Amino acid sequence: MPTFHIEMFEGRSADQKRKLVEEVTRVTCETLGCAPGAVDIIIAEVKRENWATGGVLWSEQK
């Protein structure tokens, strides 16, 4: 069973997350030939103060 871990900044709506998991599931099933019930998706929402790129926290980027 494919399992996807998606990390993203917090703040997206339930509708946006619903659409995301529907599309990831659809493409996975088309590509791998598996049933939708075999696809697990875990969304982890991260605060900008806990994510850095290039040594700079996203909460401090301009």
Swiss-Prot record:
Identify the domain of life.
Bacteria
> Sorted alphabetically, which SUPFAM superfamilies does this protein's record hold?
Tautomerase/MIF (SSF55331)
User: Which residues are named in the active-site annotation?
Assistant: P2
Is the keyword Isomerase in the record?
yes
Q: What class of enzyme is it?
A: isomerase
Please give the Gene Ontology molecular function terms for this protein. isomerase activity
EC number(s) of the enzyme? 5.3.2.-
Q: Which controlled-vocabulary keywords does the entry list? A: Isomerase
Fetch the InterPro entries from UniProt.
4-OT, 4-OT-like_dom, Tautomerase/MIF_sf
- State the family named in the UniProt similarity comment for this chain: Belongs to the 4-oxalocrotonate tautomerase family.
Q: What is this protein called?
A: Probable tautomerase RSc0807
Q: What is the lineage of its organism?
A: Bacteria, Pseudomonadati, Pseudomonadota, Betaproteobacteria, Burkholderiales
